Amino acid sequence: MMQQLLALVGALATLILTQHAEGTAPASPSPVEISVLRDCIAEAKLLVDTAYNHTQKSIMQRLRSGSASPMDLLAYFKQPVAATRRVVQAADYMHVALGLLEERLQPRGSRPFNATDVLTEPQLRLLSQASGCALQDQAERCSNKYRTITGRCNNKKHPWLGASNQALARWLPAEYEDHRSLPFGWTPGKRRNGFLLPLVRDVSNQIVRFPSKKLTSDRGRALMFMQWGQFIDHDLDFSPESPARVAFSMGVDCEKTCAQLPPCFPIKIPRNDPRIKNQRDCIPFFRSAPACPQNRNKVRNQINALTSFVDASMVYGSEVTLALRLRNRTNFLGLLATNQRFQDNGRALLPFDNLHEDPCLLTNRSARIPCFLAGDTRSSETPKLTALHTLFVREHNRLAAELRRLNPHWSGDKLYNEARKIVGAMVQIITYRDFLPLVLGRARIRRTLGPYRGYCSNVDPRVANVFTLAFRFGHTMLQPFMFRLDSQYRASAPNSHVPLSSVFFASWRIIHEGGIDPILRGLMATPAKLNRQDSMLVDELRDKLFQQVRRIGLDLAALNMQRSRDHGLPGYNAWRRFCGLSQPRNLAQLSRVLKNQDLARKFLRLYKTPDNIDIWVGAIAEPLLPGARVGPLLACLFENQFRRARDGDRFWWQKWGVFTKRQRKALRRISLSRIVCDNTGITTVSRDIFRANIYPQGFVSCSRIPKLNLSAWRGK
């Protein structure tokens, strides 16, 4: 019975992705009876729920048996949970119900049609309500004094703008094979702009790959610069993958068979691959979960599970249930919860997630250390990322304790909200004052992003779909090791240089190998990798990602390019046009844009036209702007996104009325260096923490780093 049901789901999923064919208009289907629509909705719910349950049981079984692959680990952290899962489930109900309806109504032998074109407005409302999509658009009164956890009511006119679990913004229309949902590269022989797309693994091999001897360290940026980029990215966006991670047809495990069946979109292996010799093998890949269709628009979009604001949601969460779990509910002091089993030299660590089958346990079975719990599910991805999460939980609790000393009459909720508000402002200041000028170049950011001029309710603050790929530029700055340094900034410990491929999901390294101080010193005193056109991504990420638990390590570059196709993102030239930049058409023009004829020739040998170059690889290949770590295209996209996140935020720290004048003056003195000083055993820090400094040059005593004076919060 289960096999038959899974087979039916597989056939249905394939049907849903059937594309609009080019040519004559479809024949008109019969009117839709309410009973037929209700039947389709009921059947869709059964199919979706069965697929979800089958997938969840399979992953749990592999985790329990210790046979989980890296894709299972990735799946665990990319799975939608709580409210996000309900939103994704609603979208799947609707997509599947529409697919069933099209199957029933389509005249035999006619071309496919769009079911939403023949449904009446009451029928569309019924479908939206029955699926759960309508619940996401409920009106509400906005009278909140503080930011909501979900980001709702930031914009009083449109309360859902920038809120969690909403569709990503589209700055350009999506481009799919079938104009609706099929990614380019799905159908063999299907052309894009007149040419076949190269395999993403082939692009990774020929453009991104480089010998380790060519690695160049960045003399101007520290590894902390790279790490803050990932931290802030996890504040802004997260597009979860489909909860159904096995091919439905006949219960096939597409990680074992490389079957291309929804939602599996495996990365194929080219001939003469330098590492994977079996061309019939693949790198598993699963599509991002869809968003609920908007109005009659059935073009696939993806959701952002996080708030779109720079609001420290990676510390506090983007869902109310998670935010409550993260708080210390044993007292009324406004504190965040911390670990009850372990400490870091007397200082707090993140609490454990307390899961029964924990993927972090697989990285060291004898250590028995589970994953940590934080505002973002990816906090245990690497110890470096965990270190920043830990740092800001400690800072919140430090602020809450100090605010209570100043205001003993404040309630626990007020202490929590005021400390959260300050931490949010800190993240905004560090990002816009210290980080972005080093990304974009100080001269350019003054000219393009400009000073803050106030809140504008007409600005759409939502994270753009393209930004979720473009901001992965930070992958090019990762060194192949995690560096840990002692109190004298020496690499004296036995595990001071750990290969990057050995630290993924290794929460045990925080507990049993010295805590976060050595990691933070390593981030401050080690230069980032410099992104160069002949050395883009280290092999620890390109060939060995999660290799410790799988026969084939994943390829992060290939995953990024496959994801851009999955999301229906337009190609390189479309984004150049969006930014008002030239659109190269031939070798000579692309050579001028890249200032590199050999690289341009490689691109055209693979893609045939610059129009088809995948946005991530095309953007990171551009020459860096003066004083920046990105080229013109990424600079344009980042400026656009970060301007929207600032000007469309009703709770921006500089907005009149959010903080008092005295409080704003006090906040201007904060720094990431000071946060390190206040919450660790480190006594000597980098003054300019994102710039490359080789100890002791550029390092000062914590006594010389300005402190935040909280007296402006007394009696507020």
Curated annotation (Swiss-Prot):
The modification 3'-nitrotyrosine is found at residue 489. It comes from the Eukaryota. Ca(2+) binds at residues 235, 307, 309, 311, 313. Disulfide bonds join 142-153, 254-264, 258-282, 360-371, 579-636, 677-702. The active site is at residue 234. CDD domains: myeloperoxidase_like. Residues 19-140 form a propeptide. Residues 1-18 form the signal peptide. Keywords: Calcium, Disulfide bond, Glycoprotein, Heme, Hydrogen peroxide, Iron, Metal-binding, Nitration, Oxidoreductase, Peroxidase, Signal. Binds 1 Ca(2+) ion per heterodimer. Binds 1 heme b (iron(II)-protoporphyrin IX) group covalently per heterodimer. GO terms for biological process: defense response to nematode; eosinophil migration; hydrogen peroxide catabolic process; negative regulation of interleukin-10 production; negative regulation of interleukin-5 production; negative regulation of macrophage cytokine production; positive regulation of interleukin-4 production; response to oxidative stress. Its EC number is 1.11.1.7. It catalyses: 2 a phenolic donor + H2O2 = 2 a phenolic radical donor + 2 H2O. InterPro entries: Haem_peroxidase_animal, Haem_peroxidase_sf, Haem_peroxidase_sf_animal. Its cofactor is Ca(2+); heme b. Heme b binds at residues 233, 381, 475. The keyword Signal applies. Mediates tyrosine nitration of secondary granule proteins in mature resting eosinophils. Belongs to the peroxidase family. XPO subfamily. PANTHER family: EOSINOPHIL PEROXIDASE, OXIDASE/PEROXIDASE. This is Eosinophil peroxidase. The gene is Epx.
